Amino acid sequence: MKVRPSVKPICEKCKVIRRKGNVMVICENPKHKQKQG
């Protein structure tokens, strides 16, 4: 999980979602998981 000020999809499988007001990227590749904060 990377925590970044700006989250962007890295590959085609990355999805940008909102969970409890947090913007997150979820992906099949665990290295692509990101969280805003």
Curated annotation (Swiss-Prot):
The keyword Ribosomal protein applies. GO terms for cellular component: cytoplasm; ribonucleoprotein complex; ribosome. InterPro entries: Ribosomal_bL36, Ribosomal_bL36_sp. It comes from the Bacteria. The keyword Ribonucleoprotein applies. GO terms for biological process: translation. GO terms for molecular function: structural constituent of ribosome. Keywords: Ribonucleoprotein, Ribosomal protein. Belongs to the bacterial ribosomal protein bL36 family. This is Large ribosomal subunit protein bL36. It comes from Brevibacillus brevis (strain 47 / JCM 6285 / NBRC 100599). The gene is rpmJ.
